[in-house]
Amino acid sequence: MLERILVLGIFLVFLLIFQKKFRSGRTKKSIVLPKEIEVKDSSLPTVLYFWTDNCVQCRTSQKPVLKNLEEEFGGFNLVDVNAIDSDELTSLFNIKTVPSTVVFSNDGSSRFINNGFADKEELLKQLEEAKN
């Protein structure tokens, strides 16, 4: 019985690691920030934040994290994108769920796509890497 619990525990750890890798990762093919997206300062990294009106996690979790990062870190552009109203962008970045975020480097190329909620530490790490 103890062996089964141990095997199940190991399986769950691997499942959590795999899930984290799936949700957040480097983009395989770099996509350039579309020209129609206006940013305040093109020399800074940019985060596209995909949300919808009926997304509770967008309002209660992801948006507060992004606002907090904006206040503390400040060195990036934040662009809100309604996933329903922006079909082209949603398709371009293969957004499957909301909230989702796409992090672009200073040169406008996509670096990370986070499907689902991305916590402050993960986004901060991605923004630091996108600056270089």
Where are these regions (language model features)?
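Short active-site neighborhood of thiol/selenol oxidoreductases, capturing the structured segment around
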Residues: 41-53
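N-terminal targeting signals for export/organelle localization
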Residues: 1-31
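Non-catalytic, surface beta->alpha helical segment in thiol-disulfide oxidoreductase systems
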Residues: 104-132
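Conserved redox-active cysteine motifs that mediate thiol-disulfide chemistry
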Residues: 52-64
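Short helix-loop-beta junction
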Residues: 66-76
